[in-house]
Curated annotation (Swiss-Prot):
Subunit structure, as described in the record: Component of the pre-catalytic spliceosome B and the catalytic spliceosome C complexes. Component of the minor spliceosome, which splices U12-type introns.
Coiled-coil intervals, chain numbering: none
InterPro entries, per the entry: ARM-type_fold (IPR016024), CWC22_splicing_factor (IPR050781), Initiation_fac_eIF4g_MI (IPR003891), MIF4G-like_typ-3 (IPR003890)
Low complexity biased stretches: 667-676, 684-705
Keywords of the record: mRNA processing, mRNA splicing, Nucleus, Spliceosome
Cellular localisation: Nucleus; Nucleus speckle
Function: Required for pre-mRNA splicing as component of the spliceosome. Promotes exon-junction complex (EJC) assembly.
Source organism of this protein record: Gallus gallus (Chicken)
Biological processes per GO annotation: mRNA splicing, via spliceosome
Annotated MIF4G domain residues: 169-352
This protein's name: Pre-mRNA-splicing factor CWC22 homolog
Family: Belongs to the CWC22 family.
Amino acid sequence: MKSRVTQINHGSNHERKERYSPRHRSLTPEDRDVERDRSRSPRRRRYSDDSRYDQEYSRREYYDDRSSEGRRMERGRDRYYEKWEERDYDRRRKRRLSSPDHRSPERSTVQGSNTHEEATSKKKKEEVDPILTRTGGAYIPPAKLRMMQEQITDKNSLAYQRMSWEALKKSINGLVNKVNVSNIENIIHELLQENIVRGRGLLSRSILQAQGASPIFTHVYAALVAIINSKFPNIGELILKRLILNFRKGYRRNDKQLCLTSSKFVAHLMNQNVAHEVLCLEMLTLLLERPTDDSIEVAIGFLKESGLKLTEVSPRGINAIFDRLRHILHESKIDMRVQYMIEVMFAVRKDGFKDHPIIPEGLDLVEEEDQFTHMLPLEDEYNPEDVLNVFKMDPNFMENEEKYKALKKEILDEGDSESEPDQEAGSSDEEEEEDEEEDEDGQKVTVHDKTEINLVPSVGTIYLAIQSSLDFEECAHKLLKMDFPESQTKELCNMILDCCAQQRTYEKFFGLLAGRFCMLKKEYMESFEAIFKEQYDTIHRLETNKLRNVAKMFAHLLYTDSIPWSVLECIILSEETTTSSSRIFVKIFFQELSEYMGLPNLNARLKDITLQPFFEGLLPRDNPRNTRFAINFFTSIGLGGLTDELREHLKNAPKMIMTQKQDVESSDSSSSSETDSSSDSDSDSSSSSSESSSSSDSSSSSSDSSDSDASKAKKRRTQKKNRESDKASRKKQEKKRKSLEKKTGRRRQEDRSDSESKSERNHRNLREAHRRDDTSKYHHRDESNGRDDYEAYRRDDVSKYHQRDESNGRDNYHSGRDRDHERSKDLENKHSNSKLKKAERRASFSDDESYRHGSRDNGHRSRKRERSKSGERSYNKSSPREEEDDHRYRNGSERLREKYNHYSDQYRESRKHEDRRRENSPHRRK
């Protein structure tokens, strides 16, 4: 044991001697300590062992899926060891340098110079680093940052632009992180104070980062983007492009969380009309094309947020998506949890997405006309413009800042004008109060403003009052409290009608409101009457939807008797006075009235005797053409029951016209006779008056010779006037007589010509009928005789060749002679019958003519009846057989059938006679 210990000690002493080289001798003790610490520190050895251990593992490729985390931990541990060693080394060195034993003047001077150089280098670094570093450097308080910016005189310099960029980045990031439903309007105002055109990359990055960190506030960020997009569409487009790229990146990497956040943001942007619905349908199609559990989960989350909007704008697309989900549920092998998610999605759709509205309450902040929708497909290539996230020097920095200030002022002034209508109304009231000024004499002068400048805000207040009311009574109360002057009552009524017309569908609220105003004051009722006439005259200017709403509102006013039915006086139904728009208005108007009142009540109202003068244009009876047009119109719109009286009038119109003509003729004839008698009496009276006047003149001349010449001249003038009036009346009476005589002569000639033409037609028809009968009868007989001869000849040759007698031949000869004699008698009877018929017709015609000339003053209907009776008599006297059979046959077809049957019987009898004659002929006997 001792020998071993001595050997170890000896070996260690020997090693010490070898290690103590001249180089070690030249080094100072402090340097040797440092060398020893560096070479023999256990931390260094430990670090080298660990690194060697890591290298061995890297050679074996022993890393699993968590290798990145292991590397991260090892790097952190290595950094920690290095920092610890550096601190330990610095501590020891300071300790040795500060010891008085080892301090030398030369070394102290060297060390002092080194420390001074290090301090100056640190100061230089501190001057450069705070702002120009990559991450922005250390935190600089805002006051100090403003002071630093004020110290820089050149605002186009790199340092100033860098400072403003850092301030812009911090303010945008802070505002985006603070936004919520309650303060979004204030945040928008503060954001617009910053130059978001220059920092659009920073803004889009901040919004996407904030949404990814807190997806529960996605609807708030979507509303923020929608407001910014309405003023700066390029910023909204940039955010949407980056969202699409994030979704595609997450889909490629199978990053479910990134897909969920980005798809949810896209859904809310579509609800705010920033993104188009085609993008959403493409994303859903991509997710469900090759379904997995994660892709189905992302699709269902996306559908919950955008399903209600897609149902409205693209029902076919959403139906296809749900059909695909149903197919996946039934056919695919998916996890039970995902199956439950699909079933829940169908339940949400069945409930109408009531828990997932399109835009939550308080976030519908963009007007429809200000919205800007971007049509960006999913598969296109987009540039995310990441350069905008990094600072870049702008050579025209101050010019761009001034441009943005002008743009900001314009946007903020516009927003203030839209958000403060009440302030404008208040200022207008103040201006009205200031209109009352005083003269220099102290008298008060009232200035009336007739420029109607205040009419526009009053229209705005009316519209706001109407739209903010829950029911019509509250609205009427609000409008009456505004104290409109009488000159603006019609304007108020027009405003109510315009609000009703602008609705998508008719709302009964406006009809009830207008009815309430009509019941309150007569002026409102008269205003609505005038508006009805104006609207009907200019109905062609309205669109179909507005026309329908206006018609339904006026129908409500008429049904409730808020305005009188006399307003229908302006409606004239005819082909010339109506247009397509007016016919549509009348159609909707009366259909609404029939729906309110019912067809019987409406018909009774239209038949009201007191209102008939106002319905003359609506139900015209002046012209059969207009009457027929009105009947066809009401029948085509399903209200034919209103035209029963018009139909009766149209049926009886010819009769009424004839009776009116007859009355006119009789009145003309009576007036002519009266005028004759009056003319005779006038002539007698004129002669007697002339005689009396002459006698009076003579007496006056004899008695009073002192009459003045003026009175004589007056008398002469009056006499001349009387004579001229008598002549004019006589001429008129003569003209009337001549016209009446011409009319009566024409009518007589027309009646004669009509009767003659009718009688000639009847004669011709009868002659042609008799000729046809005779010719057909003879043709039948000849044909039958030829056929019978041939058939009898064959029959006789076969069966009766040996049976013939002379007696039969003689009988047949005599029978043939008798038959010829009968035929000649028939022809004579026919000729005699036709002559008798002609004579009877002439006699009846002469009787008819004498009767017609005798009863000339009877009506037109009596003449037609007598003419028809005489025609029937003449026709009935045509043949005795027809007189006997007339009580049996009423139809002409039956008479013809009997006639043909009679001819067929004659044909059979003649055939039998011919057969017998041929059989018993002497030629056959031979």
